[in-house]
Amino acid sequence: ITIFDLDDIKELNNTDALFPNNWVTFHQDNTAVIYPMMAKSRRKEKRNDILKYLEEFESFRIEKVVDLSYLEKDGFFLEGTGSMVLDRINKIVFACESSRTSINALEVFCKKLNYSSVVFEAVNDDLPIYHTNVMMSLGQETAFICSESIKDQKDIKHIHKLFGISERKIIELSIAQMIQFAGNVLEVENTKGQSHLIM
């Protein structure tokens, strides 16, 4: 498993810079997408020098950059794979609406990358969950989800149905587990093509 260790620019004091997935994602068609961030302080994390550095490696080819940062001026935000859980195989975005996840911005993403979307409300203590990846994550064969955080039973049934169609094993998380970020799981692949779940 290859890990890229990138240093932050100390003078910028970006305390959340260890979450680059909120400002950039990379896709199989060699597209990179840059996202509109809600917190003005976090917008400094977006760095073209990082994209140029990654392009030096054979495993990273960037042929197209889709920059959605312009949506920030209209108050529309979409914080990468924090806001969205991507089913990259079936081109479906799962997203719970929040102050950091605007439907307008999500629609722009879906149109530009040819995804369909499943939008729902998810809460903890009656407050919207700020990022979808807190309560859900997808691997090729697994789906971690905190169903009890989803307000509408119809949404739960629809999401579970989609997981079933894609033959993913559903792993249910409790609210307590979600609060401890048990839903924030990544699937990575090593050089032998073997998948691993990390958290």
Question: Across the structure, where does each feature detected by a protein language model lie?
Answer:
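The feature marks the mature, well-folded catalytic cores of soluble enzymes
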Residues: 1-199
